[in-house]
From Swiss-Prot:
One of the Pfam families matching this protein, by short name: HATPase_c
Regions crossing the membrane: 12-32, 173-193
Organism: Bacillus subtilis (strain 168)
Disulfide bonds: none
Origin: domain of life: Bacteria
Function: Member of the two-component regulatory system DctS/DctR. Probably activates DctR by phosphorylation. Essential for expression of dctP.
Residues the record lists as Phosphohistidine modifications: 336
EC number: 2.7.13.3
Catalytic activity: ATP + protein L-histidine = ADP + protein N-phospho-L-histidine
Gene from which the chain derives: dctS
Compartment list: Cell membrane
The protein's name: Probable C4-dicarboxylate sensor kinase
Residues annotated as domain Histidine kinase: 333-528
Length: 535
């Protein structure tokens, strides 16, 4: 049978109450000790004053001078003793003979106290002696005649009050303080325990431990990387999948995020208090899909959490599919174009114009070979070449001449930019150029594409003579969801283009005039910013 565990509320209450009682006892001991010292100091002062008073009494001086013990002296001294609450007053002459004493049988007898000798040499002092009923304090004072010659000694004694005496004397005050202290201590302990339990969401420590272990196990078993920081940019969560994605090891909890990851983009979430969803970033050659959300409590940002998904394999497949799709599109357009030309050639043959039909066939074959050979020679990436071929064919379908500068060249990709990025960038810019002709009525519709590459830069220029972009649209050109296409468009094309340019540390310039056309000029450094600064 399991014993019922004592709740944290009662544990805190009992512990706090014990601490209050212990503190009260310690305080009481210190206080009683101070009272004892004060009582001793006051007692010594009172005893010495009493001894001095007795030594100056005329009756005492006359009795000592005449060496005559009288009842009058004993009564006078006894009266002084009672007034000053002394236990005893002893008057002795220079022969140590007692003239007064609390025990009448001792009067007239010689005193043999070990602490008396100094008093007969005109010394004024105190002595203490422990007895059966406690410690007695004795004050010694010399008695002198008119000529200042010592004629005797006055000894006044009293037992120091013990702890029991002090407690008995202060019993009412102590009772009041005990009730007040313990009452407030009990109430305070209970309120403190209740407050702590409330701060713990009414959970017991073992329940919190279980929840923490479950949460930790859940985070580490997730297939997504999870990183959380507080408003001081200190890491509070860094699960195992995140360590795999970012290739880090060890216990990272408690470290500043900058020390572990240079580009987690979490600090900007804390600063701006704005969530970012499904953003693709590149880290260590990996394609990462990231969502970053601020953690808000009571309208105050207390941290941020990021969820990362490794999309590297998916991105590679997408790149392959993109290349295949571009070639398929190019073949579809080419097939459509060839079918039209074949019909034309068949018609010419039926009309008996065989030479003209043969000339048209050679012309079509030559054009196709020239375009294919040029793209194969100048554009080393198949996906990019397939994209450009499909756009050339599609332009012919739309009645738009797509020209690629004969000096164009693409041999390799800049650092931080890959095949997928170049295909997305070219595809979106060329599609935007196609869209600019939707409202244009012109015989000369033209798109010019130039791709120039050196050891230092990759420059891409795409120009069209379409409708252009309104000046009012320019500030929002790269905003997610914003589109200038009146007949459709998702608003993601130029947003993705800008993301790719930022990732590759590139620049983009737009020159557009309404009714005249638009040009996009993009420049990527072949080496990243860090490499350039290092060199």
């Amino acid at each position: 049978m399991n014993k019922k565990k004592l709740s944290i509320r009662w544990k805190i209450t009992i512990l706090s109450y014990i601490l209050v009682i212990f503190s009260f006892l310690i305080g009481g001991i210190v206080l009683i000790g101070n009272i004892q010292h004060t009582e001793e100091r006051e007692l010594k002062k009172r005893l010495m004053n009493t001894a001095r008073t007795v030594s100056e009494m005329t009756e005492v001086k006359e009795a000592l001078a005449r060496k005559k013990q009288t009842e009058a002296v004993r009564h006078a001294v006894e009266e002084i003793r009672m007034i000053n609450e002394a236990d005893y007053i002893v008057v002795m002459d220079m022969n140590h003979i007692r003239y007064t004493h609390p025990v009448s049988t001792s009067i007239g007898k010689k005193s043999e106290g070990a602490d008396e000798e100094a008093a007969f040499a005109e010394h004024i002092y105190f002595s203490e002696a422990k007895g059966e009923i406690g410690t007695a304090v004795r004050a010694f004072y010399p008695v002198k005649d008119q000529d200042l010659n010592q004629i005797g000694v006055v000894l006044v004694g009293k037992t120091l009050p013990g702890i029991a005496d002090i407690l008995l004397h202060l019993k009412r005050d102590i009772a009041f303080i005990v009730v007040l202290t313990l009452g407030f201590g009990l109430a305070g302990s209970f309120l403190l325990a209740r407050h702590i339990k409330k701060q713990m969401f009414q959970l017991e420590p073992h329940e919190i431990v279980r929840m923490y272990e479950e949460r930790t196990a859940t985070f580490h078993s997730m297939n997504e990387g999870v990183i959380a920081i507080d408003n001081r940019l200190v890491i509070t969560i860094f699960n195992e999948k995140a360590k795999q994605i970012f290739e880090v090891q060890g216990d990272l909890i408690g470290k500043v995020i900058w020390e572990v990851l240079k580009d987690s983009r979490l600090p900007e979430i804390v600063e701006r208090n704005k969530a970012v969803y499904n953003e693709e970033i590149r880290v260590s050659g990996k394609v990462i899909m990231s969502s970053r959300i601020p953690i808000v409590m009571k309208k105050k940002v207390i941290g941020a959490v990021a969820i990362f998904q490794d999309r590297t394999e998916a991105a590679k497949m997408a790149e392959e599919l993109t290349g295949v799709r571009n070639f398929v599109e190019a073949l579809r357009v080419q097939n459509h174009e060839h079918m039209n030309k074949l019909h034309t050639i068949a018609g010419l043959i039926q009309l008996g114009k065989s030479e003209k039909a043969l000339q048209l066939a050679f012309q079509a074959s030559t054009e196709q070979e020239n375009v294919t050979e040029f793209l194969h020679r100048s554009i080393q990436n198949d996906a990019a070449a397939g994209l450009l071929l499909s756009k050339i064919r599609r332009g012919r379908e739309l009645g738009i001449a797509v020209h690629i500068d004969e000096n164009s060249s693409l041999q390799q990709f800049p650092e931080h930019v890959d095949q997928h990025d170049i295909v997305v960038l070219l595809g979106n810019l060329i599609e935007n150029a196609f869209g600019s002709f939707e409202t244009v009525q012109s015989e000369d519709k033209r798109i010019d594409i130039s791709i120039e590459q050196t050891d230092d830069i990759l420059a891409i220029l795409i120009e069209d003579n379409g409708c252009g972009i309104e000046p009012t649209h320019m500030p929002r050109l790269y905003d997610k969801g914003f589109t200038v296409n009146k007949t459709g468009g998702t608003g993601y094309g130029l947003y993705l283009v800008k993301q790719i340019i930022d990732k590759g540390s590139g620049t983009i310039e737009v020159d557009s005039h309404a009714g005249q056309g638009t040009s996009f000029s993009i420049v990527f450094p072949m080496k990243g910013e860090e490499a350039q600064h290092g060199s």
